[in-house]
Structure formats: structure tokens, C-alpha cells
Design a protein with these regions (language model features):
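Cytosolic regulatory regions built on CNB/CRP/Popeye-like sensor folds
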Residues: 1-136
Length: 136
């Protein structure tokens, strides 16, 4: 059995997959304890996109769209997460609307970080193109 479930959440052991890229899900997760890594795998090469810690959340996009998961999430060491489905999320937001604001704030930070990452790679790619043209 990959994980253990109790009333306070689900527990995962080191290396256990919480969900896989391209799987279908309608839940998000909040890390109660431990760390997870968010990864993409291409041609057998695993790239770590993020390391998330206690208090962080992941899988939230599945609450808002019908697309498959965009990455795989694995436990680093022992991890305990709280799983929240769409119905529970909407209930929590109706009781505490600031929850939605805090999530949007965190998602905005992630988008800004991704923008910076994409820009840095675009600059590197342009530099390579410029260098190769110098040798032509």
C-alpha cells in the first residue's frame, strides 16, 4: 500500500507518488508535514520544478479546470497531506473568502517565477542563436 489514510490526512513515505502527470484528479492537497517535489519526466529524465514544504499546496489547478495533472508529485521523506475536493474547497471559501485570495496570491507568485524562468531561457536561447550566427 503506497499511502496510509487517517482522519487528519493521508500519509506518504519517501518516494511515494501522490499523483502522476497526465492523471485525472479533482483534488488539491495541503502539506501538513514534510516536503514534496513537483517533477516532469521526459525521455526518462526527471526534472524537478519545485520543492514544496509544510503549509504549501499543490494540485489546485484540478479544482478549476478539466485538464489532466500537469506534473508528478512525489514525497520527500515522510509526508502528510490534507486532500480537499472541489465541494469541500467551495465550502471552505464560502466560510473564509480570504482563503481564495491567499491561494490566488500564491498562484500569482508561481506564475511570476515561471515567467522569470521562461524569460531567462529565452535570453539564453537567443544568445546561442547569436553565437551560432557569428560562426556561420
Amino acid at each position: 500500500m503506497e499511502n496510509e489514510e487517517n482522519s487528519l490526512g493521508k500519509e506518504y513515505k519517501d518516494g511515494n507518488i501522490i499523483f502522476k502527470e497526465n492523471s485525472i484528479g479533482k483534488e488539491m492537497y495541503i502539506i501538513l508535514s514534510g516536503k514534496v517535489k513537483v517533477i516532469k519526466e521526459r525521455d526518462g529524465v526527471e526534472t524537478t520544478l519545485a520543492i514544496l514544504d509544510e503549509g504549501d499546496f499543490f494540485g489546485e489547478m484540478s479544482l478549476f479546470d478539466n485538464y489532466p495533472r500537469s506534473a508528478t508529485v512525489k514525497a520527500i521523506g515522510n509526508v502528510k497531506v490534507l486532500e480537499i475536493n472541489q465541494k469541500s474547497f467551495l465550502k471552505k471559501v464560502s466560510k473564509d473568502p480570504t482563503l481564495a485570495f491567499r491561494m490566488l496570491e500564491k498562484m500569482s507568485q508561481r506564475i511570476r517565477k515561471m515567467d522569470e524562468w521562461v524569460l531567462s531561457y529565452a535570453v539564453k536561447a537567443q544568445d546561442l542563436v547569436n553565437e551560432s550566427q557569428n560562426y556561420a
